[in-house]
Amino acid sequence: MRKYIAIIIASLALFTGQAHAQRCLPKMQGIEVRADMADGFNPGGKDGGYSFGAALSTYTKMGNKWVFGGEYLLKNNPYKDTKIPVAQFTADGGYYFKILSDARKIVFVYAGASALAGYESVNWGKKMLHDGSTLHDRDAFIYGGALTLDVECYVADRIALLANLRERCLWGGDTRKFHTQFGVGIKFIIN
C-alpha cells in the first residue's frame, strides 16, 4: 500500500505542470520596456504625443516592488499649420504596492508613486519659428512626480505583458505641467 501511495504522489508531482506561485518573490528583478501614448490618442492630429521607457524593477515583501528607470516623452503642440515639439528626458524611481492578484499568480495589479527629474527641450532649443515668430518657452530642468496604475500578466515564468495608466506632474519647465500616459510593455525576469 505504501508503494502505491508513493507512486501516486510521485506521478502527481511529475505530471501536474509548473508551479505558478514562484513569482514576485523578494529580490527578484525584471527589466521592462514600455511604449505609451501621451495626452490622448489623436491619429492624424498635430497634438499627439508618445513616450518610450525602460526600467529595472526589484520585488520586495508582499509582492510590492521598487522601480527605477528612464523615459523619453515627445509631445507636439499645434501652431498654425505646423507643430512645436516638446521633449522630456526623465529618470524616475518609485514604489508600487500590489493591490490585487489572482490565486495562480498570473495577473497582478499595482498602484504606485514615483519621483521624476530630468530635462525638457522646447522646439529642440530653436527660438525662431518658420514664420519669424519667437518662442518665449525655454529649455529647462524639470522635477516632479507620477502616480501609476500598472497591470502585469505573466505569459511565461519569466515574461510578463504590461499595461499602465500614468499621470505625471512636472515643475520647472515653461510648458504643460500634467501629462496623462497610457500604454503597453513587456517585462523579462532576469533572476
Where are these regions (language model features)?
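Residue-level detection of beta-strand scaffold positions
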Residues: 34-36, 49, 65-67, 74, ...
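Extracellular loop and loop/strand-boundary signature of outer-membrane beta-barrel proteins
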Residues: 40-42, 77-84, 131-137, 169-173
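Cleavable N-terminal export/targeting peptides
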Residues: 1-28, 191
